[in-house]
Amino acid sequence: MNTYAIWVNLAPGAKDLELVAAVNAYLGALQHEGTVESWSVQRRQFGFGPSELGEFMIQIRTQNLTQLEAAFTHAARRSGEMERLHVEVYSRVQDFRSGLYRDFPDAVRVS
């Protein structure tokens, strides 16, 4: 399993519950397309965490990098309903940071 981790802060004037609803709508559409397995949205608690990373962490899980690339391809088209859903997310955030992780050790690890 691969995890695309995203850290963001709310953009000025954005509301936290609206961001979560937008993320759920967008990633739900990607899941319906078969390009995302699951996701979670988490919020920093009590201010604990590195200041470089945002208050919100979004973890998007895919079976493999091929599936993740398909999700990126949907976003890259920048048209239609998928773009409308994407705008609903990124218009509410700032200070975007991301990372890519995988389960470890993975199935191909020999030693």
Task: Outline where the language-model segments fall.
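Active-site-flanking beta-strand signature of metal-NTP-handling nucleotidyl enzymes
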Residues: 2-10
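Short, solvent-exposed loop/turn elements at beta->coil junctions and helix N-caps
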Residues: 42-47
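Short, low-order "capping/linker" segments at domain edges
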Residues: 97-111
